[in-house]
């Protein structure tokens, strides 16, 4: 699997297909395999690239890192692959990274897609949800907590469970320390005053059953980006791409002019 060096960390990525570049960024504790279904469709039209974020999947896992590190990693991936401009899609944590990239280098993002997003947070959304339900989660480890709160996060638990299990089998599991570092990287960010600098046409998709990043957070993000459209899926939670996959790909392909 190809790798590149980003500020001292070795990160793993995959490429599929040819054409204009299209980069997909996964969520917290996820990996590049989370986008297997999307890649199988997008590679017919695009040079499709999926990255294991720093601290995730097969990429190197430093003991500490930040959201700025994630953003820099994507910019260095563009440099490594000699990409001047790309379509950029991020889900949850990936959408925060995508916002940061589009703010830092607006000329390098052709179109921006933000899924299950927010534009600010004192903690990771998962840690905030755990705190909200602290009494019922007492004594549980991270994985057990995720299972317990899943009904607050997703609408189609069966589809999400199958998807996350399959993706999880294809990459190393994160240790408790690695999960903690991944959560800490998302503490205390706020892009709201900078979103006006995003020049790319933007599509924001939220699920109306998402208790992690509620639709209003996506709606706020869309309001603050000059050329953004907000869409709310009514049978999805935090994973619209998994819970309503056909509708999701219809919106994405139409947005990038492939329908």
List the model feature ranges, each with a label.
Residues 99-103, 110-139:
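Flexible "cap/lid" loop of the alpha/beta hydrolase fold
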Residues 209-213:
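Acidic catalytic loop of the alpha/beta-hydrolase fold
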Residues 7-60:
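Conserved HGGG/HGGXW glycine-rich cap/lid loop of the alpha/beta-hydrolase fold
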Residues 90, 94, 98:
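Gly/Ala-rich beta-loop-alpha elbow adjacent to hydrolase catalytic centers
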Residues 228-259:
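Catalytic active-site module of serine/aspartate enzymes centered on a nucleophile-bearing elbow/loop
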Residues 123-125, 142-194:
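Conserved alpha/beta-hydrolase catalytic His-Asp/Glu region
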Residues 36-40, 49-89, 250:
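Active-site loop/oxyanion-hole signature of alpha/beta-hydrolase fold enzymes
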Residues 198, 204-206:
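Short beta-strand/loop motif that positions the catalytic acidic residue
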């Amino acid at each position: 699997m190809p790798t590149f060096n980003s500020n001292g960390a070795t990160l793993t990525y995959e490429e599929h297909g040819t054409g204009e570049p299209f980069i997909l960024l996964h969520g917290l504790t996820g990996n590049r395999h989370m986008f297997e279904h999307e890649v199988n469709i997008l590679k017919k039209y695009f040079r499709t690239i999926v990255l294991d974020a720093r601290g995730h999947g097969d990429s190197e896992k430093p003991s500490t890192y930040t959201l700025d590190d994630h953003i820099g990693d994507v910019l260095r991936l563009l440099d490594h692959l000699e990409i001047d401009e790309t379509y950029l899609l991020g889900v949850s944590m990936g959408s925060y990274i995508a916002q940061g990239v589009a703010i830092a280098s607006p000329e390098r993002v052709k179109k921006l897609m933000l899924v299950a997003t927010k534009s600010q947070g004192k903690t990771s959304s998962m840690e905030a949800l755990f705190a909200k339900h602290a009494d019922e989660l007492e004594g549980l480890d991270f994985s057990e907590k995720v299972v317990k709160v899943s009904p607050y996060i997703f609408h189609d638990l069966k589809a999400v469970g199958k998807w996350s299990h399959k993706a999880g089998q294809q990459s190393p599991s994160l240790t408790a320390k690695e999960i903690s570092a991944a959560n800490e990287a998302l503490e205390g960010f706020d892009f709201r005053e900078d979103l006006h600098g995003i020049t790319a046409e933007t599509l924001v998709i939220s699920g109306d059953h998402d208790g992690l990043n509620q639709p209003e957070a996506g709606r706020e993000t869309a309001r603050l980006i000059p050329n953004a459209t907000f869409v709310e899926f009514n049978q999805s939670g935090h994973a619209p791409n998994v819970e309503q996959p056909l509708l999701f790909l219809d919106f994405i392909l139409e947005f990038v002019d492939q329908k």
